[in-house]
Amino acid sequence: MSKIRVYQLAKKLGISNKELIDKLKELSIEVNSHMSTVDNENADVLIELFTEQNKEETKPNVDEKPPNQDTLTDNVNESAESIQNVDKKHFKKEINSTKNVTPNGNNKKDKKKKNKKDKRKNYIANNDVSAESKGEQVIQLKNKLTVKELSETLNKSASEIITKLIGLGIMATINQELDYDTASIIAAEFGIEVEPMTDIDAEEDVFDIIIEPDKPEDLKHRSPVVTVMGHVDHGKTSLLDAIRKTKVTNSEAGGITQHIGASEIKVNDKKIVFLDTPGHEAFTSMRARGAKVTDVAILVVAADDGVMPQTIEAISHAKAAEVPIIVAINKMDKPSANPDRVKQELADQGLLIEEWGGDVISVPVSARSGENIDALLEMVLLVSEMSELKANPNRKAIGTVIEAQLDVGKGPVATVLVQNGTLFIGDSVVIGNTYGRIRAMMNDSGKRVKVAGPSTAVEITGLSEVPEAGDQLFAVDDDKAAKAIVEKRINKIKEEQLKAGQKISLDALFSQMEQGQLKDLNLIIKADTQGSVEAVKQSLVKLSNDEVVINPIHGGVGGITESDVMLATASNAIIIGFNVRPTSNAASAAKKENVDIRTYRIIYKAIEDIEAAMKGMLDPEFVEEELGKAEVRATFKVPGAGTIGGCYVIEGKILRNAKIRLVRDNIVIHEGSIDSLKRFKDDAKEVATGYECGIGISQFNDLKEGDIIEAYHMKEIER
């Protein structure tokens, strides 16, 4: 040991903490309390000094009679018994269990004190209780424990513990939780040495068994998992559509895939699993996650565009994951297609095509006409056969979450790719910081299945919470084991949280940066799906610079709630909402606590706003002013007018010329304008709180009972 605490040294020397502190101050050694440390050099000097003093003190007195032999024997026996009974939980000072009786029966204070010192010295000398040997007697304490647990661990009564806590200015009850620092101070007050518990976590015990290598004879061939990568608008989803013969592209806003999907197809009685990762740079983290679970990467490059920035990034991800790449040169039906230029640009990035003497397979295809799609699939099967993909179906399942979201009817739902083992309905699982029992499984066709083997993508329900996209799934023995693992993980996270400070907004960001007041910009990100949360998070983190670090402290699925606002208040954070809205309580709390909430439908706008704020150029001319809210309580189909919502105005007022957004379960479904606003059969300019009305939304008919229509307008503010 390089240093020793004051109370440990005092115990070793057989004196009180106060005496030792006074002595240290006399020797100009700075200490503040019994928990302060003294280096070995100074400790040796003190030991030598006190040893000399004790020698003078304990010179034999000729007039004093020797102690009674029986008393000495009793003392020695008691000391020996005390030493033998020392353990981690019930370590007591030997000196407390030994009676100090003088030969003539006198109980004089000075002799009692002297006997204590002698016994301490004898104990140290005879039993070599050094700092090192004490290691066996150190009690291990958990990071968090109650007063009752501490009293049991230290073998002291709860009232003694509470008395010590009151002495420290802490008013506690028997069930109050204490942290390790407080508990260690209490232990030191009783002269008991403690250290943090370093036991093996339950999850390590469980996962060591789960991740045990499979025996070669148990391994069987499994289907390949393919990720389609490439630059935005190069035709990844269209290529998958051609393969699956579906039309996903038409349903995606702006033709850009925003959520990961997984699908299975059969080619010559062999199965291939496709992961459709989004192509835009904003979803880099989702694409990186796809590369981790994939066996083959299809790199889509448009024959007329060539290699683009996100193409290079996709190559990097595939190479980092050591995934074999097949290049699909798409849009070959276009007159401007130039495959040779594409091959040259790929060679510049380290991908040398086979026909040019390299080892990368390339297939010219057309997603629109279906040209060479079969050849591409044959190449996928060929590459997967060369990779010898195997898994053990006869073990507990291991998999990865591809996508996760909160479904109104089903609760937390996760799309999982089973990578090893077999997942059954009724299995207890741990996924990241959540757990559950599999209630139902659906394949990519929407059919219920009872079993999911290796290389199978299924949607599962029965989880306690929405997991993180990219979390690993482990099947465990039972719910009890799953819950224990998750509780340990959550406790670790809780121990690392909570900050406070001055409120921050985007408008004041640059001025605080200039004054040096702001070093971290804390963000809370809420979105409609977990994949979107990750995408927004990764995009904003990239904006960090030398002056300010973008720090997403929390991300979640669903609307912005009051608890999010409270976290923002405590953490000095800005709330970013992507495709979600704040609840009424959250909006009120944000106004009261002066928390900045920014909501976006397009990810680029969020990036632009924060970038502009960091450069000091954010000068908003318009702000959104909420006018009112109406709840849809019935729907009516009117010929020529579409679907009309029978609404009740629950807040503010609805204006005929206002802009509106339709919110369902705190997620924005549509933004637009009011087509018609009526009270009974008459047109109305506005409808106030507490009145019913009929609302028709321009070019939108998917109204449902329970939807909230929010009316607002953009108000110009003074610069």
Curated annotation (Swiss-Prot):
Q: Which PANTHER family match?
A: TR-TYPE G DOMAIN-CONTAINING PROTEIN, TRANSLATION INITIATION FACTOR IF-2-RELATED
* Coiled coil region boundaries: none
Q: Source species, please?
A: Alkaliphilus oremlandii (strain OhILAs)
Task: Enumerate the residue ranges of region (G1).
Answer: 230-237
Ranges of biased composition (kind: Basic residues) = 109-122
Tell me one Pfam family matched here: EF-G_D2
Say which family it is in: Belongs to the TRAFAC class translation factor GTPase superfamily. Classic translation factor GTPase family. IF-2 subfamily.
Q: Which GO terms describe its molecular function?
A: GTP binding; GTPase activity; translation initiation factor activity
The segments labelled G5 in the record are: 366-368
Grouped into one coarse class, the protein's main location is: cytoplasm
| Sites where the protein binds GTP | 230-237, 276-280, 330-333
Q: Where is the tr-type G domain?
A: 221-390
- Indicate where this protein resides in the cell: Cytoplasm
Q: What is the lineage of its organism?
A: Bacteria, Bacillati, Bacillota, Clostridia, Peptostreptococcales
Function, as annotated = One of the essential components for the initiation of protein synthesis. Protects formylmethionyl-tRNA from spontaneous hydrolysis and promotes its binding to the 30S ribosomal subunits. Also involved in the hydrolysis of GTP during the formation of the 70S ribosomal complex.
User: Know the name of this protein?
Assistant: Translation initiation factor IF-2
A cellular-component GO term for this protein: cytosol
Q: Where is this region: G2?
A: 255-259
Region G3, residue ranges: 276-279
Q: InterPro entries, alphabetically?
A: EF-G-like_DII, IF2_II, IF2_N, P-loop_NTPase, Small_GTP-bd, T_Tr_GTP-bd_dom, TF_IF2_bacterial-like, TIF_IF2
Primary gene name: infB
CDD domains (alphabetical): IF2_eIF5B, IF2_mtIF2_II, mtIF2_IVc
Q: Where is this region: G4?
A: 330-333
> What are the Basic and acidic residues biased-composition ranges?
54-67
